[in-house]
Amino acid sequence: MSRIGKVPVSVPGGVHVRVSSGVVEVEGPKGVLSCAFLPVVTVRVEQEYVIVARCDDSKRARACHGLYRKLLSNMVVGVSEGFSKTLVITGIGYRAEVQGRVLVMALGYSNDFTVLIPSGIEVRVESSTRVIVSGVSKERVGEFAAQLRRLRLPEAYKGKGIRYDYETIVRKVGKSGVK
């Protein structure tokens, strides 16, 4: 039995879970998320818990059991609290600003990067070097934050680039020079 899959998902107040023909819809104060599940698992709602159980003991069902339970848990947390990732921009002249639904980033190239902010994602710039990406869907928030990070990956010699707030960059020692 999947150790993650057998734990029921707790549903907080204000969040409603609906299951209909393989599609689970979770609605809360921050928004609505839905996900289609394969018929190898069954999802049922009991009072303030959602229980994910597998239909048989096939390899596919065992693989999907914990996955679908965690996806459902992320949906419940997303519509009740939301998810966010913080990016830190390091480098001389590197900065970011939001103009409407566009994020403009100066990252040391001759032209600035303009990135369209997708729907369902909110971007705040606390200081010109700190960008907070937030939203309801954990997958979409992480995907957009990774897309921004790829614009200028942190380099190991000076540490310049875009990194996650929790990330530490292992610095390399440069050339020692002639003695």
Curated annotation (Swiss-Prot):
Which GO MF terms are attached to this record? rRNA binding; structural constituent of ribosome
Gene3D superfamilies xref list: Ribosomal protein L6, alpha-beta domain
Q: Which GO terms describe its cellular component?
A: ribonucleoprotein complex; ribosome
* One Gene Ontology biological process: cytoplasmic translation
A Pfam family of this chain: Ribosomal_L6
SUPFAM superfamilies to which the protein is assigned, alphabetical? Ribosomal protein L6 (SSF56053)
**Assigned keywords, A-Z:** Ribonucleoprotein, Ribosomal protein, RNA-binding, rRNA-binding
Annotated coiled-coil positions are none
Main function: This protein binds to the 23S rRNA, and is important in its secondary structure. It is located near the subunit interface in the base of the L7/L12 stalk, and near the tRNA binding site of the peptidyltransferase center.
* Quaternary assembly: Part of the 50S ribosomal subunit.
Spell out the family assignment given in the record's similarity comment.
Answer: Belongs to the universal ribosomal protein uL6 family.
UniProt protein name? Large ribosomal subunit protein uL6
